[in-house]
Amino acid sequence: MTQVHMTTGHAAAIAIDGADKVYPDGTHALQPVHLSIRQGEFVTLLGPSGCGKSTLLKMIAGLLPVDQGSIRVDGQPAGSPQKSDQSLAFVFQSPTLMPWATVQANVRLPLELQGVPSGEIGPRVEEALRLVGLQQFAQHLPNALSGGMQMRVSIARAFVTDPSLLLMDEPFGALDEITRHKLDGELLDIWRQRQITVVFVTHSIHEAVFLSSRVVMMAARPGRIVDELTIAEPYPRTQEFMVTPEFNVYARHLQHSLFRASEAQADAELS
C-alpha cells in the first residue's frame, strides 16, 4: 500500500489567542491558551482528567463562552451567528441518539433541522451510512446495536452535514480495546478521504500517537498546554505502526511530558 504524508493548508482553521475560562464557582478551568490549528490537521488534545480538554473543545464549538482572549474558527469568532452551523460537527462521549427513532432517522435529523430540501436528504443519509458501514442497519433502532455501532451512527450523523471541522470528545473512551482500535482506523480513513480538520480529545497516549498529525499535551489546575508533538509518520497507519520503534519514541516523549506536568502540579499543591 502506498504511504503518503497528509498535506495541510497554511491558513488557520482555528486560531486560539489567550483564551481563558473561569467557572462561576471560581474554578480556573483554563489559563490563557494560545494554539493555531491548520486546515486539514488531525490534532489531539491529550491529558489527565480536569486539564480542560473538553472545556477547550466546547469553547471552540461555541458551546461555552470565552471569558478572555479569543477563539476564531475559519476567521469568525467561535459561536458567531455568521459562522455556518453546517461547517462544524461535534461528536460527544456518548452517542446521544434518539432511542425511539431508527438509525436512518437519527442521521437525517441535522439535515432536517437545517432545512435541507427533502430530495437531497435521502442520498446524503445513504452516503453517510455507507461511510461508516451501516447501510444494512438503516431501519434498526439504536438499542438493537452494539456500543461501537451506536458510535458509528453518531459519526455518520456528524458527517452527513459535510463539515469542514469535526470536534470529537473522547468518542471511543467507553468501548473495548478491539472496537476502539477498529474505529480509530476507520476514523483515519474517513479523515483522509474528506480532508477535513479534526480536533480529538483522549486520555490515551497510544490513541493520540496513532491518530494524530500533532498532539497537544495539557495539564491541570489550571488547564494549560505544556507540550506539543508533531507525529511525522506517513498515512495510512495500520495497527503494525503501534509496535514500531518510532511509535514507542513518540509515546515515551508524551509519557515523560505528562509525568513532568503531574510532578509540577503536585509540587504546586504542596507549596
What positions do the PLM features span?
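Short hydrophobic beta-strand elements within the C-terminal catalytic ATPase subdomain
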Residues: 73, 217-218
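Non-catalytic connector elements of ABC transporters
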Residues: 2-3, 240-271
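A generic structural motif
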Residues: 22, 218-219
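A general structural signal marking secondary-structure boundaries and capping sites
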Residues: 67, 163, 219, 233, ...
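Short, glycine/charged-rich "phosphate-handling" switch motifs in NTP-dependent
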Residues: 214
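Conserved beta-strand-loop-alpha-helix hinge in the C-terminal portion
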Residues: 220-249
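ABC family nucleotide-binding domain
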Residues: 5-206, 211
